[in-house]
């Protein structure tokens, strides 16, 4: 029996259509999942490595970063913060996404006020904040946050016996606003009587420029944890600027760097890398 050539062509066309439909369906399912994951905020408790900040045992720091104009997740984060009752709160930059127009700054101020009513709150700026710096600084100030932009504050926690430590907030590295010499002490000046020092730096690569300064722990965001992490691949698809520290605690020389995956995202969503806020406890 001879098969008609048009029958073969119809069969091949049918297979192509089925394959195209399957690809479209899988793509739609993947996009839906990535959107769902990107809006499923996690509350994660992290214990710092032993001895990373001497003298501050028991300190509880709530870490938030990279909101990227996502007000609903900021509202969820504020609710989580109210339940966590930390000793202090730090925001590590990128309140907005710089190419998105923001007309509801008052709503962000209200949520930042919720956060700062829980505990003393501090912030540094991220790369997306720089183009909107006046707006961002207003939101932070009216929201009750102390902005540390290449400046430092001396903090004491009554619950811990008012032991004083230094909190440094650096400007953004990528945007050329990174000036540790304005707020940090050279290593040799503190060798005999070092004060516990925690650094807020939106970009964790800032650690590489602090070799001449004394510090104990850096808190950073910026990476979004890689945002898209494929199974069986050690490097996230969206690894930021070749960064090797994507999330969690990482040793660096004799210090520690903690990187949060952050709250918001840019692009299609998240995969295997959900958003988070973190409650860090110093052991």
Give the location of each predicted region.
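N-terminal short leaders/motifs
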Residues: 2-17, 94-101, 203-214
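Short, surface-exposed loop/helix-turn segments at secondary-structure junctions
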Residues: 231-243
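His/Asp/Glu-enriched short active-site or ligand-binding loop at hydrolase and phosphoryl-transfer sites
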Residues: 225-230
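Structural motif
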Residues: 61-63, 90-92, 122, 167-169, ...
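Membrane-embedded segments
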Residues: 58-154
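Conserved catalytic scaffold of divalent metal-dependent phosphoesterases
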Residues: 52, 97, 129-217, 240-283
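N-terminal membrane-anchoring alpha-helices
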Residues: 1-55
